[in-house]
């Protein structure tokens, strides 16, 4: 059916009809043609005059009276014309007045508002799911009411606009199977300068098994589609998209945990005593006052002993009055204000919540009489309180008889009381909105959704949530790393969603998903006229069974920025995409798209997804991806079961290997390095947070467009201030490619599965012959990733300002880490549950915490692999092993077969006292297995300055590696390591057709300590390679566990000019050799400088002529001796010389009768060639002075690096701690320490604007001086830090002064043994801050060291304006690359 209300000649709110080709340079999407007043109505002509009667003929004589008559007639006509003009004027005025009055003040015409275009006609199509609507050219409709239609097609010159008004009172829902915007058509909901205020919903309907529903070519079903030349402008109300917590929210909402109790037949009076400052249940007891007068008296005595202010909850169970003595009743009446206790009868249900000393005004109680084993409901008492930190909580007591069963219960909880403190102004978030709080633990499944409640007492940076959190969510910088949870708004006032079935059906992968995954989708095709989307919500979008059906898909759009001729480039801004069934935002063969402030939550498959490996210049700015689950579409989306069970695209019979080919689902899947990531957060994925993967050529629908992408050679785009956490495999992953060929018998793996053969090696202009370009990873925050914080492999890569082949692929490249902070076990201990499988003891503090794998999994701060890698100017904290687990600051890849270069170097490192294991080389056992693979044995690094080992310019290697030792080496038993001086390089020993052999290498100085290597390749490979690290200037023998290989190549790796090693290779004694040297040029894959080796007659002769190309074959020992000597210089990090890779090639001709001999010549070689052990480079003296310049220069690594944070620490001491010989009580401010050496109080104040310490004062007691200090001695806008030592006089008296410094109420400090207080005095007096907190302990408990990172110069502090505001580097970078 076609709807046509007739043509219109009014101005049209659409772009030029022919798409990109006809856009003017000044076209601004969302702007309508200026409103013009309608042309004035033509005035009706005056009534025709009667034809004049000719006067009678008379003489032409001048006559005065006749002339006067003519004047009078003329005046009459003029007056008549004047009346007519006045009438016309008032008519026009009346028309305008009617028009204006017909528009309320809220609808004053605004040229930026599409719904106010006078060309629009009201449209109310009604509800008919069979009605097919086509909007033709010249038809411009304003949808004024909800509608249900089969489909809408907006053709060239047609437009649809959703109605709106200033109050946002519209609530329009459009249900349809699809909306198709064709060339020249337009759909508008709001505009960038006229935000949509009402509620607009587009519901896309349909099932995947509706075969009668025809698919639209290129679009499919259940979609909103934009064809070439179409316009889509959707702009909801501006709202904060996502922000961070600024105060930790504990599980249950209460730091001490909630309390719930319910029991039948708990006879007597049940009691709970609750700390009014913390909500902790202090006493949990039952008193059988029915049976025992002693219990009754004990209850009375306990109540009398409680301090004033303590919360008490009482509830009867079964019967409570038979032996409830009068004195106890009187105590309950006097202390708790009960009015019912004296009149309780047998089996009455009674409940009370009150405050000691609060009298009747603080008492809430209820009683219900017992009759026929029933009380007709609960006796319920409930009161609300708040902690000293301002957290609301409820104490409930209840008692009931029902169906002959008595029930007693208590609850202490924060249900509907939890307030979230947030970093940004969220006054645009409203009650009823849905939000999600990200996990800050290992499991991404600890992300939690909440509904917002009204909160009249909240400030603009606070919201109150319904219910309570199940898990802890960190809201602060811990141990120097920003671990604040992301908090995202899911609700928007423009919603596009798929209408879903209640469960999975048909062929929608129901074996993997129990729910319907056939959602709606939005597809944008190339050469559109205008597409801008902002502040909209996409829910239940994407189709898991169908490729190319994503929540938002820019499909082969080409350049969508100014390079593509768009004066206003396309963008996606502040979208909420959640509960999606296939990705979040797909950028497919599209360049220059800006995606900012967008949330992708709970999706199947890669979330922010670059598809074909040719997408470039796209900008991802301040986006959030969390809870990214596996999907089925691509091998890289799949988990184990999907990988092995979906085999329709592998070669017949092949079963994929999940770890190698699948299991890569990521929140950000970046298929080409020339894209920009700034201030994004990947807060939970089944595999990786951000994965840079490489394509050899364009893939997918773009297959064949670009035969060679050179992605591995392309410089990295901007990477700044991104964060990755709660990901199972890795936070950041830069490695591997996807397979770009179909499955064959030769390679049965599926097209686009993972492939391990890529190495990122960026060069200028993607040309390997031009200089390398370092990839800069600037400001990476990584924490709580199960396996790896970051896995980065390839060319020159530099990581800075961050918190957590047979040859290397790119000659001369290296990876570098600087100005970074590594934390082993942070104070973020996590919450047991939420699919966290492991819960165990921490090594630093001995407290229970979540663990990444199990309790034995080794935790490594900086993991050395391959190389060369360099780390310097970095700090390590909290690496301490347990009895079950090794936790080390510096470690190595587990079960490593690969090479480790001695050029890996470390320097200027700082280790916090909480680091008790600086380095570890593994031991046989869990996770390390036998610890005997080639890479395990050759683990080594260069300690440049001794900051890790204490010996400058030394090498640290595994303790049992005697290829690198000398007698002066220093053993490090705890590390399973040894520290040695010397020069070290590698020889790669490559053999042909002998890959099943093991190689035994002995140094002549330690012949009884050989190293046995298996080789890095499989036993069925055509060649094998062994990669030992050798001390230069020493001699070695090499032996085989089988027949010697016919062809062996020795490659000199990391040799400096004139470095040498004397090598003796074992062969049968009748072997004939052809030995040559050459230089391998990797650039042209050729060999140069080929020279033959000649024989000499003795080892002594060989030693004299080591500069020459000579060899000696000792037939008696079976050893072929020759020098591996570098003749050319090596530059920088190059592993080969400047001339190329120097090699020695040995072709052995072995007699037929000796071809099966096992060539192990050890027995003949020694003691003949044994030598005394010695060092070439003397061991340095140990460092004696601490390195003051070592470590990272920053104290805090935050996700808002333009803001400054103050590191503050408070260590208070109780009397018991002093008795236990702890003598340290102090306050530190950015490492400036103020000691408290005697019993008393220490107060330090800091200017909250500059971070400068303004005062530090010690008081032995709360005397008049200290009181005066509290009253007048603290400057406005001051951070106030308070520590205590011992038990000074008037300890509890300090409480009265803390409320004015940020405490939510006057705390109870009676019986407390230590205090640590972080407070703030605002410009106008008390100004509680999210970081303000009071910590106390009593009895045998201790506070320990308390640390807070406090933000400086917040807007709330009312600091004076600065001359130079901090530079927002993220915005500067965005401006630069946009």
Curated annotation (Swiss-Prot):
Changing residue 608 to A: Defects in angiogenesis. Residues 1-82 are cytoplasmic. Residues 257-414, 1203-1363 form the GG-type lectin domain. It is found in: Cell membrane. Residues 1-77 are annotated as: Disordered. The chain crosses the membrane at residues 83-103. Its EC number is 3.2.1.35. It comes from the Eukaryota. Belongs to the CEMIP family. Cell surface hyaluronidase that mediates the initial cleavage of extracellular high-molecular-weight hyaluronan into intermediate-size hyaluronan. Acts as a regulator of angiogenesis in embryos by mediating degradation of extracellular hyaluronan, thereby promoting VEGF signaling. Acts as a regulator of heart development during myocardial and endocardial morphogenesis: involved in the looping stage of heart morphogenesis. Stimulates migration of endocardial cells and increases both myocardial and endocardial fusion. This is Cell surface hyaluronidase. The lineage of its organism: Eukaryota, Metazoa, Chordata, Craniata, Vertebrata.
């Amino acid at each position: 059916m076609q709807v046509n209300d007739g043509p219109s000649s009014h101005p049209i709110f659409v772009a030029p009809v022919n798409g990109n080709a006809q856009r003017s340079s000044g076209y601004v999407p969302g702007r309508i043609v200026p409103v013009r007043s309608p042309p004035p109505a033509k005035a009706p002509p005056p009534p025709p005059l009667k034809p004049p009667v000719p006067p009678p003929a008379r003489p032409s004589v001048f006559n005065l009276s006749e002339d006067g008559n003519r004047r009078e007639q003329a005046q009459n006509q003029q007056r008549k014309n004047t009346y007519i003009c006045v009438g016309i004027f008032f008519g026009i005025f009346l028309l305008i007045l009617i028009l204006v009055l017909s528009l309320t003040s809220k609808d004053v015409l605004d040229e930026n508002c599409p719904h106010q275009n006078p060309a629009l006609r009201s449209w109310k199509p009604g509800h008919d799911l069979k009605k097919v609507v086509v909007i033709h050219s010249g038809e411009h409709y304003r949808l004024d009411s909800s509608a249900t239609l089969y489909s809408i097609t907006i053709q060239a010159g047609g437009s649809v606009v959703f109605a709106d008004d200033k109050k946002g009172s519209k609530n329009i829902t459009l249900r349809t199977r699809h909306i198709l915007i064709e060339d020249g058509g337009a759909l508008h909901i709001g505009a960038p300068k006229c935000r949509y205020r009402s509620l607009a919903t587009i519901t896309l309907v349909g099932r995947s098994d509706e075969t009668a529903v025809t698919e639209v070519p290129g679009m499919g079903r259940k979609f909103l589609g934009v064809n070439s030349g179409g316009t889509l402008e959707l702009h909801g109300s501006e709202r904060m998209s996502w922000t961070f917590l600024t105060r930790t929210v504990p599980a249950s909402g209460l730091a001490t945990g909630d309390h719930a109790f319910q029991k039948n037949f708990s006879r007597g009076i049940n009691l709970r005593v609750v700390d009014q400052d913390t909500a902790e249940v202090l006493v949990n007891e039952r008193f059988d006052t029915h049976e025992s007068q002693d219990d009754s008296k004990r209850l009375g005595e306990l109540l009398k002993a409680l301090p004033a202010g303590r919360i008490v909850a009482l509830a009867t169970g079964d019967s409570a009055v038979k032996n409830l003595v009068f004195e106890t009743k009187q105590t309950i009446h006097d202390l708790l204000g009960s009015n019912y206790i004296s009149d309780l009868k047998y089996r009455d249900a009674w409940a009370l919540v009150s405050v000691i000393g609060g009298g009747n005004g603080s008492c809430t109680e209820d009683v219900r009489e017992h009759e026929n084993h029933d009380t007709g409901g609960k006796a319920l008492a409930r009161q609300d309180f708040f902690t000293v930190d301002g957290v609301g909580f409820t104490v409930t007591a209840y008692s009931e008889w029902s169906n002959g069963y008595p029930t007693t219960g208590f609850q202490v909880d924060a249900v509907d009381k939890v307030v979230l403190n947030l970093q940004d102004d969220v006054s645009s978030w409203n009650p009823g909105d849905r939000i999600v709080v990200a996990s800050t633990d290992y499991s991404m499944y600890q992300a939690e959704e909440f509904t917002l409640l009204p909160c009249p007492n909240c400030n603009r940076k606070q919201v109150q949530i319904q219910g309570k959190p199940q898990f802890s969510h960190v809201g602060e910088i811990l141990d120097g790393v920003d671990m604040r949870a992301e908090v995202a708004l899911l609700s928007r006032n423009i919603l596009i969603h798929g209408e879903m079935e209640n469960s999975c059906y048909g062929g929608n992968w129901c074996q993997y998903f129990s729910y319907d995954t056939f959602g709606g989708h939005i597809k944008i095709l190339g050469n559109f006229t205008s597409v801008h989307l902002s502040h909209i919500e996409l829910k239940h979008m994407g189709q898991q069974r169908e490729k190319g059906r994503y929540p938002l898909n820019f499909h082969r759009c080409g350049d969508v920025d100014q390079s593509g001729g768009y004066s206003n480039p396309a963008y996606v801004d502040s979208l909420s995409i959640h509960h999606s069934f296939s990705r979040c935002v797909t950028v497919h063969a599209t360049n220059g798209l800006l995606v900012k402030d967008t949330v992708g939550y709970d999706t199947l498959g890669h979330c922010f997804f670059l598809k074909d490996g040719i997408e470039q210049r796209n900008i991802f700015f301040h986006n959030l991806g969390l809870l990214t689950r596996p999907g089925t579409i691509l091998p890289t989306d799949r988990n184990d079961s999907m990988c092995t069970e979906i085999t329709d695209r592998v070669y017949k019979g092949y079963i994929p290997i999940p770890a190698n080919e699948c299991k890569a689902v990521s929140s950000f899947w970046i298929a080409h390095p020339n894209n920009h990531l700034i201030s994004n957060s990947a807060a939970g994925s089944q595999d990786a947070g951000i994965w840079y993967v490489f394509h050899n050529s364009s893939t997918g629908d773009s297959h064949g467009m670009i035969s060679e992408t050179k992605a591995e050679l392309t410089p990295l785009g901007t990477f700044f201030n991104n964060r990755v956490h709660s990901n199972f495999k890795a936070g950041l992953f830069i490695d591997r490619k996807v397979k770009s060929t179909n499955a064959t018998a030769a390679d049965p793996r599926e097209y686009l599965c993972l492939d391990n053969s890529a190495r990122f090696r960026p060069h200028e202009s993607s040309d390997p012959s031009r200089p390398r370009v370092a990839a800069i990873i600037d400001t990476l925050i990584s924490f709580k990733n199960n396996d790896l914080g970051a896995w980065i492999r390839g060319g020159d890569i530099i990581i800075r300002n961050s918190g957590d082949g047979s040859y290397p692929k790119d000659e001369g490249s290296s990876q570098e880490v600087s100005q970074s902070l590594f934390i082993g076990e942070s104070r973020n201990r996590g919450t047991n549950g939420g699919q966290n499988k492991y819960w165990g003891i921490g090594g630093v503090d001995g407290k229970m915490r979540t663990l990444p794998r199990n309790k034995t999994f080794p935790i490594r701060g900086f993991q050395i692999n391959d190389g060369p890698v360099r780390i310097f100017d970095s700090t390590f904290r909290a690496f301490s092993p347990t009895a079950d687990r090794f936790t080390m600051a510096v470690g190595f890849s587990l079960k490593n077969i690969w090479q480790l270069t001695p050029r890996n170097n470390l320097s200027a490192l700082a280790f916090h006292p909480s680091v008790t294991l600086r380095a570890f080389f593994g031991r046989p056992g869990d996770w390390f297995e036998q610890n005997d693979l080639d890479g395990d044995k050759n683990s080594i690094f260069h300690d440049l300055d001794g900051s890790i080992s204490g010996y400058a310019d030394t090498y640290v290697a595994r303790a049992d590696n005697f290829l690198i030792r000398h007698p002066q080496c220093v053993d490090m038993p705890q590390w399973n390591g040894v520290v040695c001086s010397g020069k070290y390089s590698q020889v790669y020993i490559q053999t042909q057709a002998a890959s099943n052999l093991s190689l035994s290498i002995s140094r002549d100085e330690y012949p009884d300590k050989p190293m046995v290597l298996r080789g890095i390749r499989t036993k069925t490979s055509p060649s094998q390679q062994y990669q030992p690290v050798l001390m230069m200037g020493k001699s070695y023998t090499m032996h085989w566990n089988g027949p010697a290989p016919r062809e062996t190549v020795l490659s000199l790796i990391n040799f400096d000019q004139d470095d040498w090693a004397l090598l003796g290779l074992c062969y049968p004694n009748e072997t004939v050799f052809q030995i040559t040297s050459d230089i391998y040029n990797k650039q042209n894959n050729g060999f140069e400088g080929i020279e033959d080796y000649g024989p000499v007659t003795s080892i002594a002769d060989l030693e004299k002529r080591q500069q020459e190309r000579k060899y000696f074959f000792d037939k008696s020992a079976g050893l072929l001796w020759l020098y591996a000597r570098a003749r050319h210089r090596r530059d920088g990090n190059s592993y080969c010389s400047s001339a190329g890779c120097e090699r020695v090639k040995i072709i052995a001709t072995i007699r037929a009768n000796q071809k099966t001999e096992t060539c192990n010549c050890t027995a003949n070689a020694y003691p003949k060639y044994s030598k005394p052990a010695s060092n070439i480079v003397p061991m340095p003296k140990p460092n004696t002075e601490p390195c003051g310049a070592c470590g990272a220069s920053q104290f805090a690594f935050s996700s808002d690096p333009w803001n400054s944070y103050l590191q503050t620490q408070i260590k208070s001491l109780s009397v018991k701690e002093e008795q236990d010989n702890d003598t340290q009580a102090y306050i530190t401010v950015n490492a400036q320490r103020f000691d408290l050496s005697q019993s008393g109080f220490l107060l330090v104040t800091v200017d909250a604007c500059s971070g400068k310490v303004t005062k530090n004062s010690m008081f032995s007691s709360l005397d008049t001086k200290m009181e005066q200090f509290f009253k007048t001695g603290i400057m406005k806008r001051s951070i106030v830090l308070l520590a205590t030592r011992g038990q000074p006089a008037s300890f509890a008296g300090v409480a009265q002064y803390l409320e004015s410094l940020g405490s939510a109420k006057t705390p109870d400090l009676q019986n407390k043994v230590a205090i640590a207080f972080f407070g703030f005095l605002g410009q106008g007096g008390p100004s509680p801050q999210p970081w303000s907190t009071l910590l106390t302990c009593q009895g045998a408990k201790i506070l320990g060291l308390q640390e807070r990172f406090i933000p400086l110069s917040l807007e709330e502090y009312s600091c004076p304006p600065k001359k130079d505001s901090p530079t927002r580097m993220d915005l500067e970078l965005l401006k630069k690359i946009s």
